[in-house]
Amino acid sequence: MQIINVVYSFLFAAAMLPVVHSLGINCRGSSQCGLSGGNLMVRIRDQACGNQGQTWCPGERRAKVCGTGNSISAYVQSTNNCISGTEACRHLTNLVNHGCRVCGSDPLYAGNDVSRGQLTVNYVNSC
């Protein structure tokens, strides 16, 4: 009986541990992402793919659609590494193919985990 109580206690404790899931490619972003009409992701992708000679470093806004209020921009984050324009084009194409229309993030590295580095398209305060 004592062993059963120990097993049940262990199973209960294990069930209470938080489940951690890596957030892979996704169409998440600011709450304002849903307010925009049209398919801005394609415009962002086309800008980036039209200028593949650029280097994209963390925080630099390389492709953007500027609006009167907020704007949408693509940038690298969650890493210290830069990526090539060709890589940026590939990641933005991944987002378009995933069905993202305005905002989203694509992991930079194998493992589909954006916490290790990501190319993000999201609303920003200014161009």
UniProtKB/Swiss-Prot annotation:
Subcellular location: Secreted
Cystine residue pairs: 27-100, 33-103, 49-89, 57-82, 66-127
Keyword Disulfide bond (UniProt): yes
Key words, A-Z: Disulfide bond, Secreted, Signal, Toxin
GO CC annotation: extracellular region
InterPro entries attached to this UniProt entry: Killer_tox_Kp4, Killer_tox_Kp4/SMK
First and last residue of the signal peptide: 1-22
Stored Pfam families: Kp4 (PF09044)
Recorded superkingdom: Viruses
Practical and industrial applications: The KP4 toxin expressed in transgenic plant can render them resistant to KP4-susceptible fungal pathogens such as grass smut fungi. Successful tests have been made in tobacco and wheat.
A Gene Ontology molecular function term of the record: toxin activity
Known function: This protein is lethal to sensitive cells of the same or related species. It specifically inhibits voltage-gated calcium channels. It inhibits cell growth and division by blocking calcium import.
Subunit record text: Monomer.
Protein name: KP4 killer toxin
Native source species: Ustilago maydis P4 virus
